[in-house]
């Protein structure tokens, strides 16, 4: 009976935190009122601020491009690992950037711009990290988000969204060429869309209101790049789902490098500035894919350390932290990764 009572109290607390409004009235998303509500909330654990990345809720929905696979899709497409054979001690703090300092890509923050390609960015970022990590620094390749969004038809609809797991399957089956940002213009197929600014003042142009269309698939490299398209491809050896278990996810990161994860984005997240995010208020907006690079504990609150794809001016220098170990916003339910072909 005691266990049931504790469960009911815990459930009530959870639901209360997820439907909280001011004076029982819905708070307008992206508004100053929502920002104030979050910053004044005693249990939020994070700070909100004004952002120009999203001009409206409809605008934000378009850019939330991570689609969820159902259980059958996951089961039929790739195995799920539980790492029961990995007997490694899990530290309270772990940062892939410090573990593998020779792999500079781990510290890199990309920008998907005005395109719902987060599913592709989370994938190529983690793949890029893993190429360096799993080769012991012997290989280095910045994989192209453009090649993935334009040529992987099974993945989804490019700038209109896609499946993170299928991106990893594509890496194994078809391979992905290299490609940096529009600004550095490196590799076979650099990203065609510019980095854009989240705030009124900054070093990048304003994000604007234009939503980019998915580029056509071109199996050629940019002019002046010497390696042919097919020869520039890098392949994975295996793609897999990571079991919905905090310790399994941690072990996978410790052994093989950052992973890609997708989570449910609520209205309050659109104003995230700093701290350890947990859902405080607002309805669901859509799905977003990111790269988990580590974890830690602050003031007894465990968190995931996460790299976003909205450039380094957003959040904590391009990163954010989210409560760990309770599947906050389903972030531990949709984790995918893979091994490189050696």
Curated annotation (Swiss-Prot):
Disulphide-bonded residues: 103-132, 115-159, 151-217, 152-155, 188-221, 196-207
SMART domains to which the protein is assigned, alphabetical: Pept_C1
Biological processes per GO annotation: proteolysis
Pfam family, one: Propeptide_C1
Keyword presence, Signal: yes
InterPro entries: Papain-like_cys_pep_sf, Pept_asp_AS, Pept_cys_AS, Pept_his_AS, Peptidase_C1A, Peptidase_C1A_C, Propeptide_C1A
Superkingdom of the organism of origin: Eukaryota
Propeptide boundaries: 18-89
GO molecular function: cysteine-type endopeptidase activity
Catalytic residues (UniProt): 118, 288, 308
Enzyme Commission number(s) from the entry: 3.4.22.-
UniProt keyword list: Disulfide bond, Hydrolase, Protease, Signal, Thiol protease, Zymogen
Signal peptide: 1-17
Tissues in which the protein is found: Intestine (gut).
Function noted in UniProt: Thiol protease. Has a role as a digestive enzyme.
Family: Belongs to the peptidase C1 family.
Protein name according to UniProt: Cathepsin B-like cysteine proteinase
Lineage, highest ranks first: Eukaryota, Metazoa, Spiralia, Lophotrochozoa, Platyhelminthes
């Amino acid at each position: 009976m005691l266990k049931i009572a504790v469960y009911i109290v815990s459930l009530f607390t959870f639901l209360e935190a997820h439907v909280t409004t001011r004076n029982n009235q819905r708070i307008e998303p992206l508004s100053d009122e929502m920002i104030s509500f979050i910053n004044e909330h005693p249990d939020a654990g994070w700070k909100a601020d004004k952002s120009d990345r999203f001009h409206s809720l409809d605008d934000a929905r378009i850019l939330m491009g991570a689609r969820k696979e159902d259980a059958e899709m996951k089961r039929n497409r790739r195995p799920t690992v539980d790492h029961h054979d990995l007997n490694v001690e899990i530290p309270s703090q772990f940062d892939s950037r410090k573990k593998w300092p020779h792999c500079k890509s781990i510290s890199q923050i990309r920008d998907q711009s005005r395109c719902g390609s987060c599913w592709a960015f989370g994938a190529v970022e983690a793949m890029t990290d893993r190429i360096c990590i799993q080769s012991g620094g012997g290989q280095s390749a910045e994989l192209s988000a453009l090649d993935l969004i334009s040529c992987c038809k099974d993945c989804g609809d490019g700038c209109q969204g896609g499946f993170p797991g299928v991106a990893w399957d594509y890496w194994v089956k078809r391979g992905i060429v290299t490609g940096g940002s529009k600004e550095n213009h490196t590799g076979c197929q650099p990203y065609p869309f510019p980095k854009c600014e989240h705030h009124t003042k900054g070093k990048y142009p304003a994000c604007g209101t234009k939503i980019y269309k998915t580029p056509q698939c071109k199996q050629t490299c940019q002019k002046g790049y010497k390696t042919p398209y097919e020869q520039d491809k890098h392949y994975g050896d295996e793609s897999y789902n990571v079991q919905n278990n905090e310790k399994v996810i941690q072990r996978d990161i410790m052994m093989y490098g950052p992973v890609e994860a997708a989570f449910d984005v609520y209205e309050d997240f659109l104003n995230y500035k700093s701290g350890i995010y947990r859902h405080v208020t607002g309805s669901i907006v859509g799905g977003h894919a990111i790269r988990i690079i580590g974890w830690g504990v602050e003031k007894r609150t465990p968190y995931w350390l996460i790299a976003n794809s909205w450039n380094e001016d957003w959040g904590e220098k391009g990163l954010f932290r989210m409560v760990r170990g309770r599947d906050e916003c389903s972030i531990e339910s949709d984790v995918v990764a893979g091994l490189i072909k050696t």
